[in-house]
Amino acid sequence: MPAFITGARGHDFGRHSPADLLSAIGQAGFACTQLAYTKAVEGVKSYADVTPALVAATKEAAAQTGVQIAVYGTYVELSYADEDKRKAETAKVLSQIGNANYLAAGCMGSETTPMAKQPGVSRKDAQEALLRSLGEIMPACEEAGVLFGIECVYHHAMNTPEATKMVLDTIASPNLKIICDLANYIGAENAALDAQRRIWDKVGSWYGDKICAVHFKGVAFKPDGSHYSTSLEDSVIDYAGGFAMLRQLPQASLPVLREEAVPARAASDIAFMEQFYK
């Protein structure tokens, strides 16, 4: 069973200097974070603003606070069918591999582009674009010894366990990993408990050993099927079943990162999350 390490997404704490950000995360009771410079650090509007001095200050802050960089978040659109746009997004990842390595981040991470961002593009075409992006990214990650985690999201290009398995099998890189957000696998039509359990079975048996990080957030559904964010207590997600799967995995440790964290609720959120670890 992995040792689960409770963390939080950095930009839920607002924009700060690296020292103030990691200090706030640690003081809230979290041991690790997902750091996205363009969302969480003051003065960073683009990756051009991520300077060697800033990265060095981040490494120092991590050492001082003991808050690990579990995921180096890049938030890029790897599934753009437009080649010029796709290559520009891929270039952002390539530019950050050295920084992720220097910070000893557990992995880099990205989602795979909402389908709504490119109307008229089929999911098949979006997935083929994703494969092209990963084909460019993974050799550089392998050379640097950096893991790259992609996240399955219900309304994105890579949207099901089946699609995730296809991407992993096609790319076949030992450095390609999965960020597992239980809530992001679920839509209104598969929110019933037995349907969720079938998904967890697929995730665990098909690629559970490839999971490099876990995201934890609350979701429920409106009568029209649209989803909305909730507190963890009001969520319809089957955390018990999901963690029953995660507890069977061979990884020595896994970060579990609270997304949409409210710092004032950190203590109750941590208690809620950690009840599923054993």
Segments predicted by a language model, with ranges:
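Active-site-proximal loop/turn and secondary-structure-junction residues that shape catalytic pockets
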Residues: 12, 37-39, 76-78, 112-117, ...
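Generic structural signal for well-ordered alpha-helices
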Residues: 21-23, 52-59, 93-97, 131-138, ...
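Catalytic domains of carbohydrate-active enzymes, especially glycoside hydrolases
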Residues: 19-39, 103-104
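Glycine-rich, proline-tolerant flexible connector loops at the mouths of alpha/beta enzymes
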Residues: 34-58, 112-118
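Acidic/histidine-rich catalytic cores of soluble enzymes
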Residues: 6-7, 33, 132-236
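Active-site acidic/histidine proton-transfer and metal-coordination neighborhood
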Residues: 15, 19-20, 57-65, 78-180
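Hydrophobic faces of well-ordered beta-strands that scaffold small-molecule active sites
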Residues: 2-9, 33-35, 69-74, 108-110, ...
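A short, acidic, flexible beta-alpha connecting loop/helix-capping segment that sits on the rim
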Residues: 13, 220, 256-267, 272
